Amino acid sequence: MVIMTFGSGFQIENDSVSYLQRMKALNSYAADKGIAIGGYSLLASRGAKPKDAAISHHTGYPAKTREEGSRFGLSPCIASDWGSDYFKRLKNFFHTTGMNVFENDGSYPGDPCSSTVHSGHKGYLDSQWKQWNRISSFYQWCRAKGIYLNVPDWYFLMGSNKTPMGYVETNWSLPRSYQEVIERQNI
């Protein structure tokens, strides 16, 4: 199994015909070798334009800190129009390329959002639930298509095949030699 990341030049949200055809050819090559292939998407803490961001209940502006309501920094609200487009692009990628592995970093389970203009929720009180439903529906779609999922443990009952055991983001800020010990503990 190969999970490509943006560090390798992988761009799961790139919907240009030439890129998708290149990824389709790569998938065919991998499949001929008996290798499942797919990629990674950073969803949490990726940044967002103000109109797409999870809006703080405390400030009325995009949430950037835990005090403002964000778990991992400036993140998009996946119940916004941006979120709808994001999932359309992902579905198009998998449908067009035939790749069958997906690792998603987020949404943990989505920062609450006070926006009243996002198309996928009414306001603060329903925002996290609507985001949960949107991403859970996507994961269920993936599983119905046979796509292997490595996603946060909040979604294990929504179709995840694997979830990191003992994963803590701060582990990867440690010196490399400590990271190796942690990696081996998680195996």
Features from the language model and the residues they span:
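Short, small-residue-rich loop/turn micro-motifs
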Residues: 6, 106-111
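Glycine- and acidic/polar-rich repeat regions and solenoidal domains
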Residues: 125-126, 177
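Histidine/acidic-residue-rich catalytic or RNA/ligand-binding cores of hydrolases
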Residues: 48-54, 112-120, 154, 158-169
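Catalytic domains of carbohydrate-active enzymes, especially glycoside hydrolases
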Residues: 1-7, 95-101
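Active-site-adjacent "subsite" loops/lids of carbohydrate-active enzymes
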Residues: 18-99, 108, 165-187
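Aromatic-lined substrate-binding rim segments of carbohydrate-active enzymes
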Residues: 9-37, 120-125, 134-135, 141
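Aromatic-lined carbohydrate-recognition surfaces of secreted/lumenal glycan-active proteins
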Residues: 31, 35-50, 106, 131-162
